[in-house]
Amino acid sequence: MGMLVPTALAARLLSLFQQQLGSLWSGLAILFCWLRIALGWLDPGKEQPQVRGEPEDTQETQEDGNSTQPTTPVSVNYHFTRQCNYKCGFCFHTAKTSFVLPLEEAKRGLLLLKQAGLEKINFSGGEPFLQDRGEYLGKLVRFCKEELALPSVSIVSNGSLIRERWFKDYGEYLDILAISCDSFDEQVNALIGRGQGKKNHVENLQKLRRWCRDYKVAFKINSVINRFNVDEDMNEHIKALSPVRWKVFQCLLIEGENSGEDALREAERFLISNEEFETFLERHKEVSCLVPESNQKMKDSYLILDEYMRFLNCTGGRKDPSKSILDVGVEEAIKFSGFDEKMFLKRGGKYVWSKADLKLDW
């Protein structure tokens, strides 16, 4: 009986010690867990415990936020007029209106684009030299280079209305002049609708090339490959003209422009297959400045502003306009542009586009 008392006492003391040890261990475990969180000791593959007060979907919210970042309009094509002096059968920006913004309103819109991140502006039409005999265009070009200090200012034109006087007045502010030339055969140009009576489109192209060299403007050629020129060999002509880029497009249908009931053109007869387009590219693979653009690459990879400064969404095979950036701002309007930035980069949309960086041998 005398032995039972010490034994019972020892058991009681052991039980109390175990309880205290358990409490101490629990406290240490909690402390260690917080140290791991604070010092970043958690395994990268394991989920970290949620801190009280932090939303459960923080990571998802951040990912969603990243995906809804506003699109930056790095490169924009501004079709400020739809009027043209040519009648190309496959044209996909036709003369459905005669509207042109007042010059100061156009400048205001360009300033908004600059503030949103614009680096390159490309003026197109229609025929951009048609408005005020090129003076409207020249003033916009000068404004973009001199006041907005854009790295690149370019123009796409059929070239028929350009005079040397324009180069003298505005050439220093222009980085790239792209001339549309679909064929070096005048009969083919006439079939396409790129002809003006006795004027020779090819001879005019050569004259423009000289002026670009004389006034230090980078020279570029755009060609739309279609049913009438798909078998042509342009190698020697392109090499002789030596453009900085030769953009080769596959003829494209846009509902309401060159296809469908409301269209001003019927381009179906100009269409070629993907295989025919690839054959043309293969024939010209030795031309180092060749930049091909199939219909797939063109789709949704351009930011296009129309004459009202509305972004045009072409994802549905037609041109659905946003509200004007002059009314709602760039960030709001660009949400409806349908722009595919990945395809823009994939097609080579970002390149050396400033003549200061091109370092050409004038």
Curated annotation (Swiss-Prot):
Its EC number is 4.2.-.-. Induction: By interferon type I, type II and LPS. Induced by infection with Vesicular stomatitis virus and pseudorabies virus in dendritic cells, presumably through type I interferon pathway. Pfam families: Fer4_12, Radical_SAM. It catalyses: CTP + AH2 + S-adenosyl-L-methionine = 3'-deoxy-3',4'-didehydro-CTP + 5'-deoxyadenosine + L-methionine + A + H2O + H(+). It comes from the Eukaryota. Keywords: 4Fe-4S, Acetylation, Antiviral defense, Endoplasmic reticulum, Golgi apparatus, Immunity, Innate immunity, Iron, Iron-sulfur, Isopeptide bond, Lipid droplet, Lyase, Membrane, Metal-binding, Mitochondrion, Mitochondrion inner membrane, Mitochondrion outer membrane, S-adenosyl-L-methionine, Ubl conjugation. Acetylated by HAT1. HAT1-mediated acetylation of Lys-198 in turn recruits UBE4A that stimulates RSAD2 polyubiquitination leading to proteasomal degradation. There is a cross-link at residue 207 (Glycyl lysine isopeptide (Lys-Gly) (interchain with G-Cter in ubiquitin)). One of its GO terms (cellular component) is endoplasmic reticulum. It is a peripheral membrane protein. Expressed at higher levels in atherosclerotic arteries than in normal arteries. One of its GO terms (molecular function) is metal ion binding. The modification N6-acetyllysine is found at residue 198. Its cofactor is [4Fe-4S] cluster. Residues 64-73 have a biased composition (Polar residues). It is found in: Endoplasmic reticulum membrane; Golgi apparatus; Endoplasmic reticulum; Lipid droplet. Gene3D superfamilies: Aldolase class I. PROSITE patterns: RADICAL_SAM (PS51918). GO terms for biological process: CD4-positive, alpha-beta T cell activation; CD4-positive, alpha-beta T cell differentiation; defense response to virus; innate immune response; negative regulation of protein secretion; negative regulation of viral genome replication; positive regulation of T-helper 2 cell cytokine production; positive regulation of toll-like receptor 7 signaling pathway. The N-terminal region (1-43) is necessary for its localization to the endoplasmic reticulum membrane and lipid droplet. Interferon-inducible antiviral protein which plays a major role in the cell antiviral state induced by type I and type II interferon. Catalyzes the conversion of cytidine triphosphate (CTP) to 3'-deoxy-3',4'-didehydro-CTP (ddhCTP) via a SAM-dependent radical mechanism. In turn, ddhCTP acts as a chain terminator for the RNA-dependent RNA polymerases from multiple viruses and directly inhibits viral replication. Therefore, inhibits a wide range of DNA and RNA viruses. Belongs to the radical SAM superfamily. RSAD2 family. Homodimer. Interacts with IRAK1 and TRAF6. Interacts with FPPS. Interacts with HADHB. Interacts (via C-terminus) with VAPA/VAP33 (via C-terminus). This is S-adenosylmethionine-dependent nucleotide dehydratase RSAD2. The lineage of its organism: Eukaryota, Metazoa, Chordata, Craniata, Vertebrata.
